[in-house]
């Protein structure tokens, strides 16, 4: 694109900077060899405007950023509504985006008019992708990374809106040029003076547009002196420029250089032997280079063969990897299916954890009570104390059995009975403390491990489900994007078809007009009517002959088709008889 290469300010033969307009130059300054790329900073609204004609203007442009943002936003919205209709984002969303995704969607809709299949890379940074595209298109100002952070900020987003507005202008210019390409390429060749005049006019228009973008408010004001100053500078530049004098100097410098080269050739007349030696040496170097090239070609062929073998092995490994991956996916699907069939819900797992914690508290209370009772002397003081201890033991045993039945825990131990004397009471307490309590703790710990396993399994299942949902949502978004892109492509194709139809209709109207003109000419000349009548008679005779031949051909084809139908019927009868014979043979064999 224009502006990709760095302009070096190339000099002419006499050292003067060229003012020729080339694709690698911008209309910046015609008085020197300075380049646009020397300073990459965009001129601020508070800095003096750069003049095309080497006259400094110290007036300060007004900081009317709101009107600029409003104009650019309306321009972008109208463009998207014109080409995208209902798919276009709202003007409020263009002016104040909610994030980078809104800006990316707007940029894709606009840039796809230049590149139909363009889609923003998923893992690419917006600062690098968008800035690189605008730089390649020749946008005259750099887009800093701070303009994107945060998106929609007052310090950077006006620059991005201005860039999108410039991109819309490029699209409209590109479409206009593509529609009038024939006149641009094959128009009349202009004379040198006319071409120079048009070149200067184009330079003046470019500089005027640049000043207009820097200070739109002053340019749009009818009472402003902007246009008078611009015309005065243009008139002054025409008066100061003298192209004929420059052409004379250029021709003189070219003649001087040619004379210098002729003198060098005359000076080298006596060095034929050295030149021949140099030529032979160069031929020897060429021969060596050819030998080296042949060696490299042999090496290249050998490497290509090895590369083909490596690629075949790689394809085999890839196919094996795909098979293994498919087996792994099948196993994962089976595991997921088993989890869905034999698993528990999250609510049941939480309820089991609560019950487990309550059981732990009850067991701890029982353990503390047993420890306290084991420290007592177990000396019977009277009959009332024994009854009290017996009732406590029976109540504790009943509570333990209720808890175990509620937890659905089976104890394969000797049941606890009511003690009859002090010795039985002591033995039962020791049995409860040493046998029942450890067994209950062991089973509760096992139940805890089972619950933790179920919980981890359900957490893995939830993570897998979230990943699957995310993949499906991404797939849905991609499908929506593809559908929208296909719809835009179809709409563009319909527009192109409409344009083609319009051109065909215009051509048809032209042909009708030409036909009318020819008919008028035919009426004026009677000989043409006679020729037309003769030609019509010949055409009618030819048509009758054609009809007769066609009827003869139809009759011949119909006869051939009848014969083919008869032969097909005979073949079908033979086929049926053959099937009957085969059925008889099968029955005989069976």
UniProtKB/Swiss-Prot annotation:
Keywords: Cell cycle, Cell division, Centromere, Chromosome, Coiled coil, Cytoplasm, Cytoskeleton, Kinetochore, Meiosis, Mitosis, Nucleus. Disruption phenotype: RNAi-mediated knockdown results in embryonic lethality. RNAi-mediated knockdown results in defective cell division characterized by irregular chromosome segregation, premature spindle pole separation and defective formation of kinetochore-microtubule attachments. In addition there is reduced localization of the spindly-like protein spdl-1 to kinetochores. Changing residue 8 to A: Rescues embryonic lethality and chromosome segregation defects in single knockdown mutant. Changing residue 44 to A: Rescues embryonic lethality and chromosome segregation defects in single knockdown mutant. Changing residue 100 to A: Embryonic lethal and inhibits NDC80 complex binding to microtubules. GO terms for biological process: attachment of mitotic spindle microtubules to kinetochore; attachment of spindle microtubules to kinetochore; cell division; gonad morphogenesis; meiotic cell cycle; mitotic chromosome movement towards spindle pole; positive regulation of kinetochore assembly; positive regulation of mitotic sister chromatid separation. One of its GO terms (molecular function) is protein-containing complex binding. Its main location: nucleus. The keyword Coiled coil applies. Changing residue 144 to A: Embryonic lethal and inhibits NDC80 complex binding to microtubules. Pfam families: Ndc80_HEC. GO terms for cellular component: cytoplasm; kinetochore; microtubule; Ndc80 complex; nucleus. Residues 269-342, 450-525 form a coiled coil. It is found in: Nucleus; Chromosome, Centromere, Kinetochore; Cytoplasm, Cytoskeleton. Belongs to the NDC80/HEC1 family. Acts as a component of the essential kinetochore-associated ndc-80 complex, which is required for chromosome segregation in mitosis and meiosis and spindle checkpoint activity. Plays a role in kinetochore assembly and recruits the checkpoint protein mdf-2 and the spindly-like protein spdl-1 to unattached kinetochores. Mediates the formation of end-on kinetochore-microtubule attachments through recruitment of spdl-1. The ndc-80 complex synergistically enhances the affinity of the ska-1 complex for microtubules and may allow the ndc-80 complex to track depolymerizing microtubules. Component of the NDC80 complex, which is composed of at least ndc-80 and him-10. The NDC80 complex interacts with knl-1. Interacts with the RZZ complex components rod-1 (via N-terminus) and zwl-1. This is Kinetochore protein ndc-80. The gene is ndc-80.
